């Protein structure tokens, strides 16, 4: 039977009251806002608590909220197959010191997710065993999923707009 969100939140707040900044529920899914320095403690508690048993890290990702403080957020989705329940943990990450502790010690599968988040957003996962780029070339400058990265794409030429686009190209015309 699925765990009630209120029960999960109550157990979490009772065990780690100083780690929780807030919570929200949307369409039946519980999100808990966690202090960055306490994410490992919260994740370990959710994994190891005999009643909760959120023992599967489904994924984690970065989000860029340009213009908001904190600018970045790392979002973790955990599943308890035993209790048929999910929980979302959200950690705010400062733009000027974009770091959060790594969860690879709890879930080795976090390795590639954290590397991708580092590569795309520049969020540093302290304690990660091999925090290197995973998608972009090693000599790539910047982090392409940040919202302040300039878009340098060219408009694609189709039959309806090719004359306008080709008029600005430096190649020879027939």
Swiss-Prot record:
This is NADH-quinone oxidoreductase subunit C. Gene3D superfamilies: NADH:ubiquinone oxidoreductase, 30kDa subunit. NDH-1 shuttles electrons from NADH, via FMN and iron-sulfur (Fe-S) centers, to quinones in the respiratory chain. The immediate electron acceptor for the enzyme in this species is believed to be ubiquinone. Couples the redox reaction to proton translocation (for every two electrons transferred, four hydrogen ions are translocated across the cytoplasmic membrane), and thus conserves the redox energy in a proton gradient. It is an enzyme of class 7 (translocase). Signal peptide: none annotated. NDH-1 is composed of 14 different subunits. Subunits NuoB, C, D, E, F, and G constitute the peripheral sector of the complex. Its EC number is 7.1.1.-. Keywords: Cell membrane, Membrane, NAD, Quinone, Translocase, Transport, Ubiquinone. It comes from Roseiflexus sp. (strain RS-1). The keyword DNA repair does not apply. It is found in: Cell membrane. GO terms for molecular function: NADH dehydrogenase (ubiquinone) activity; NADH:ubiquinone reductase (non-electrogenic) activity; quinone binding. It catalyses: a quinone + NADH + 5 H(+)(in) = a quinol + NAD(+) + 4 H(+)(out). One of its GO terms (cellular component) is plasma membrane. PANTHER family: NADH DEHYDROGENASE [UBIQUINONE] IRON-SULFUR PROTEIN 3, MITOCHONDRIAL, NADH DEHYDROGENASE UBIQUINONE IRON-SULFUR PROTEIN 3. It is a peripheral membrane protein.
